[in-house]
């Protein structure tokens, strides 16, 4: 599992640890909670679905929107491209996360970096508000989901191993 961490150290999380479809994705101080942890699931062709550890749901585009300002929320797995993301390395070692359907990047509404800032998609802009640090979470020390069987990350797929440098920052 990974944290999707902003340059200021805050992370993307599921708002109020809500398990329902449509729950918002926002920025918040990292506290080790499983609703702040994400698994990158290989979707083929260099694409990833981003699954929340706590809810098991995926980062998705609200209402399937593709315009600037479309909010991010969580939703159960679909076959649509609104849940598919590509990772792009930046010169400073961070990662941009681009939605395949919308061809836009994970961003924060109003470039707000305080607790509660809503995640959205936006066209490429030069700046830190679209750059993320993907930080691996140690499964033995992080808080875990209530599911007792979930103790370790599963073995990576060949595609995940190939792109592992993209995921570890």
Which role fits each region the language model picked out?
Residues 79, 123, 154-156, 162:
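Intrinsic disorder/low-complexity segments
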Residues 117-121:
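Low-complexity, intrinsically disordered Gly/Pro/Thr-rich segments
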């Amino acid at each position: 599992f990974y944290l999707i961490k902003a340059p200021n150290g805050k992370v993307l999380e599921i708002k109020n640890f809500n398990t329902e479809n449509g729950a918002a994705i926002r920025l918040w101080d990292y506290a080790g909670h499983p609703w702040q942890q994400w698994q990158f699931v290989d979707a083929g062709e260099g694409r990833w679905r981003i699954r929340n550890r706590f809810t098991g749901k995926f980062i998705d585009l609200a209402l399937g929107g593709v315009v600037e300002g479309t909010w991010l929320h969580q939703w159960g797995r679909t076959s649509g491209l609104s849940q598919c993301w590509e990772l792009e390395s930046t010169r400073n070692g961070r990662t941009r996360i681009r939605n395949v359907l919308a061809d836009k990047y994970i961003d924060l509404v109003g470039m707000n970096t305080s607790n509660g800032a809503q995640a959205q998609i936006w066209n490429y802009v030069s700046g830190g508000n679209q750059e993320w640090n993907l930080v691996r979470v140690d499964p033995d020390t992080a808080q875990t989901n209530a599911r007792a069987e979930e103790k370790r990350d599963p073995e990576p797929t060949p595609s995940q191993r190939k792109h592992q440098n993209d995921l570890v920052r």
